[in-house]
Amino acid sequence: MSDILKIGKYEFTSRLIVGSGKYPDFQTTRDATLASGAEMITVAVRRVNIMDPNEENLMDYFKDTDVKILPNSAGCTTAEEAITLFRLVREATGIDIIKLEVIGDTAKTLYPDVMETLKACEVLAKEDFTIMAYTNDDPIMAKRLENAGAHAVMPLAAPIGSGLGVQNRYNVVFVKDAVNVPVIVDAGIGTASDAAVAMELGADGVLTNTAIAQAKNPIAMAEAMKHAVIAGRMAYKAGRIPKKPYATASSPLEGLIEF
């Protein structure tokens, strides 16, 4: 049975999105991405070349694949910077699906500036971009981003690169309940079990970069993430049993042999 992830006009069979940072070279980036089964790889346009054909270009490593490049605005601290960047990206590459992130704290937490993100979202939506908006795990802001035109919201699990996993499970559920667009848990994933937890909570997908790129064996971790996302999604759809404080016998008490 198909289980398609729809983000705006785009459809994906994989619910795992990977990043492109912190790899030693583009070939390793390619190998890990293909091992993950992901159909999108996000790229910090201000740090990784996808626009200059005269320099080594990450897009060249994925031309023979079905992996879609997802430009992001990492490094931007204002709405204006992000808007300008994405206009340049679309002009140079034709890519119109984007990961919008505007960072408020560049020193320690890399938390998003949600008000600047919201301003950028309003403008870019009017220009027909397909917007995936990185935000905090706040259902109110998630709904505002949806109303502003975001096609997916991406609440953080924990600070970017921290590897802490999902720190507030209830907020993931609250965000999921608040919006009618896909919820992609982004940032803070440390290992495969973190991805599975996010999916079990009802997230529509997971984005991870550091957990794969900085693993001792990135290819093996990419494969682990692939299976974790699938397992978490299957468990969510299957429906977990309720948690109870006391035991419940798994075998019936009726018909016991009397001694």
Curated annotation (Swiss-Prot):
Compartments reported by the entry: Cytoplasm
Keywords (A to Z) from UniProt: Cytoplasm, Schiff base, Thiamine biosynthesis, Transferase
InterPro entries according to UniProt: Aldolase_TIM, Thiazole_synthase_ThiG, ThiG
Keyword NAD: no
GO molecular function: thiazole synthase activity
Reaction equations catalysed: [ThiS sulfur-carrier protein]-C-terminal-Gly-aminoethanethioate + 2-iminoacetate + 1-deoxy-D-xylulose 5-phosphate = [ThiS sulfur-carrier protein]-C-terminal Gly-Gly + 2-[(2R,5Z)-2-carboxy-4-methylthiazol-5(2H)-ylidene]ethyl phosphate + 2 H2O + H(+)
Keyword Lipid metabolism set for record: no
Superkingdom of source: Bacteria
EC number, as in UniProt: 2.8.1.10
Chief place where the protein resides: cytoplasm
Amino acids binding 1-deoxy-D-xylulose 5-phosphate: G161, A187, G188, N209, T210
Biological process annotations from GO: thiamine diphosphate biosynthetic process
GO terms under cellular component: cytoplasm
Matching SUPFAM superfamilies: ThiG-like (SSF110399)
Associated pathway: Cofactor biosynthesis; thiamine diphosphate biosynthesis
Pfam families (UniProt xref): ThiG (PF05690)
Active site: K99 (schiff-base intermediate with dxp)
Coiled coil (residue ranges): none
Quaternary structure annotation from Swiss-Prot or TrEMBL: Homotetramer. Forms heterodimers with either ThiH or ThiS.
PANTHER family to which the protein is assigned, alphabetical: THIAZOLE SYNTHASE
Family: Belongs to the ThiG family.
Function statement: Catalyzes the rearrangement of 1-deoxy-D-xylulose 5-phosphate (DXP) to produce the thiazole phosphate moiety of thiamine. Sulfur is provided by the thiocarboxylate moiety of the carrier protein ThiS. In vitro, sulfur can be provided by H(2)S.
HAMAP family: ThiG
Name this protein carries in UniProt: Thiazole synthase
Gene: thiG
